[in-house]
Amino acid sequence: MSSRAQARRMAGFSLVELMVSIVIGLLAVLFATRMMTDSETTKRGALGGSDSMQNGMMAMFSISGDAEQAGYGLNDPILNGCDTLFTDNSGYALAAASRDGVGVTPLAAAVIVPGADGKPDQLTMYAGSAPGGTCTTRLLTNYIGGNQLVVDRPLYGFAVGDVIVVAPENGEGKCALAQVAALTGQGAAPAISIGDVRYRYNAGALARNFDGSASRIFNLGGEANLSFHTWLVRDGVLRLRATNLGADGEAAHAVADNIVSLKAQYGFDKRDAADFDPELGMQVGEWSSAMIDADDDGVTGGPGDYQRVAALRIAVVARAKTPERPGADGVCTAQPQAIKVFGSAQPQGVDPVEVELDVRVEDDPVDWRCYRYRTFETIVPLRNAGWRPTA
């Protein structure tokens, strides 16, 4: 070995060699970091898709389960769709609707409050729990205030604490919801005592008078099982207000997170009156996001229109928990187009009414297009609509 080579070896690496080694090391670290980052991004995307699938399925299962029971105990033509006077000491309120431009609170299987400009709807579904279904009796004497409802028959199926609704038989005027405080005898006729402050619903007198022999009293079952449910989406969370979910009926309890939209449509049976017989089955002839004059009586949102609702079409949109990174141009392409629902013709031959959604979440600084979404749709027949008395 020459003396020059030996001297170079003893001197160690040159500056150029050290710099080349550092560059190679940095490139290796950068490559490994990029691999780990891409792997983590893929993992988050996969987990986010799984989360949105689970959240969406749970949300749809919960809402559709309510829809299957909607209208139980409310399917009598005298009661279904009646504008109802209602107060609750725990704060629950009936859904507001319009009847030819006048505000009402109808008691029906389902009431949709449409969200403006593609924003989420509010879907309310009502159901009683009386074991006998539509338990009813007739008011015998005029009710002009007070806490006694004298009836014309023994109160079979009624119990203290049951929720009742008093309705005019001619369908004119409002109904009133109350709660049974006692079952008593008044002379030769049995009577229902109401207006007891120990009970939750309408602790005072009814807010209107009712004519004897021309008004019915319907039993909706016990207070604990009264299923008045309002579904809504707020701040990217599916929430539920309910009469049978804790002591606070006004509170909207969280059910599923990363739910950004809830949409619903009525499925109306539009057959002529001569052909309309719910006991022989209901059929959807028209979908609508808002209430219409389905029975052609000249009144939009009347009781007859709610009695023409054969099914509900429901859509839920779930969002991935983690947004994806924008492209080199700063634009996200995870969801490049607006989300639309209800675009397919179901049942066959019925024109769809497609709806474009606004899935933006209030106060979320991330562009909505940076998230991935899953849409869930279903149609739920209101089976209780066909199981109604005709006399």
Q: What does each model-identified segment do?
A:
Residues 59-315, 321-372, 388-391:
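N-terminal pilin/flagellin-like segments and related low-complexity appendage regions
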Residues 3-5, 11-64, 68-70, 391:
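Aliphatic-rich helix starts adjacent to a transmembrane/signal segment
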Residues 1, 5-6, 96:
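Intrinsically disordered, low-complexity regions enriched in serine, threonine, proline
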Residues 375-391:
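Structural signal for terminal/edge beta-strands and the immediately following C-terminal loop/tail
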